[in-house]
Regions:
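Metal-dependent catalytic neighborhoods of phosphoester/phosphodiester hydrolases
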Residues: 48-56, 93-94
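Structured loop/turn residues at beta-strand edges in well-structured enzyme cores
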Residues: 5-8, 32, 102-103
Length: 106
């Protein structure tokens, strides 16, 4: 008996999309290959709060929306970038609670 497992669209649990102009290249490639991605927060400056994570996620989705690729609209409908915080000595418990309650932080 043959059993098969088909991954229709995998997830990437450790991706570095970078920021700024690089998003125009990295985001469309990631959106075509993956359904969900966990975006590493080690940008410059690092993503350390829920507010920064939300802004970074918006830049990621905007980069996909602004891309000139033909299937950008379809990709936007299914691409789900999940955010994490870069923890530092200054990260407060409240920062973590706020991020956890934001709905966008993995």
């Amino acid at each position: 008996m043959t059993t098969t497992l088909t991954l229709r669209l995998p997830d990437d649990w450790h991706i570095h999309l970078r920021d700024g102009a690089a998003l125009a290249t990295t985001v469309p490639h990631a959106a075509r290959a993956f359904a969900r991605v966990i975006c590493m927060p080690n940008t410059v400056p690092p993503i350390t709060t829920a507010t920064q994570a939300r802004a970074y996620r918006e830049r990621i989705l905007q980069a996909l929306s602004d891309s000139k690729i033909a299937d950008a609209e379809q990709l936007l409908a299914r691409f789900n970038p999940r955010m994490v915080l870069y923890l530092t000595d200054q990260t407060s418990v409240q920062d973590i609670v706020t991020a956890a309650n934001s709905g966008i932080v993995a």
